[in-house]
Amino acid sequence: ECFIYPHNLGEGKLYGAQENDFNYYKACALSGLGRKEEATELFLAASIGNSQPAAAMYYNDQKPDKIFYQGLALRKLEREEEARGRFNNLISYGEKHLYDVFKMDYFAVSLPDLQIWEDDMNKKNRIHCNYLMALGHLGLGNNEKAMKYFDIAAEMDNNHQGVQIHQKMI
């Protein structure tokens, strides 16, 4: 049911929104039930999409965990080199952009979700970059490093849903 958007929400799925995580978890469930062919199809679906991280400051930007799930799906498909590439992309982006100074760049509906509250966008960027590095290290099995970056992100935003969900994977 996670693939179906209720009509009464007033807005459906955003155009181009990826569902790598949904596909990955459904594939894992099907695999566990012995339905290998169906699982493989969903792992393939989970493995595709934009593999280059971005700032993800706007509500319609691809979230970094989608790339993380691409990597996990590729690993299930025994495409380890490609999987590691996804995880390394997350780490590289986080390291490169950790101290970037954020410059507002929006048009019409892409205004950042919390701009009305005047958030510190540089802080949000640092949280985002630490989260990216945590996901990358988690995917590579570097659990100590992953926990370090999850902890930094959580210290800056203890309500970060991605951190709360993925930190429990360690």
Model-derived features: where do they sit?
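Amphipathic alpha-helical segments of tetratricopeptide repeats
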Residues: 4-11, 45-55, 91-92, 154-155
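Flexible helix-coil transition and linker loops at the boundaries of alpha-helical arrays
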Residues: 7-16, 52-59, 117-121
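"A position-specific structural signal for the A-helix of alpha-solenoid helical repeats
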Residues: 18, 24-25, 32, 69-71, ...
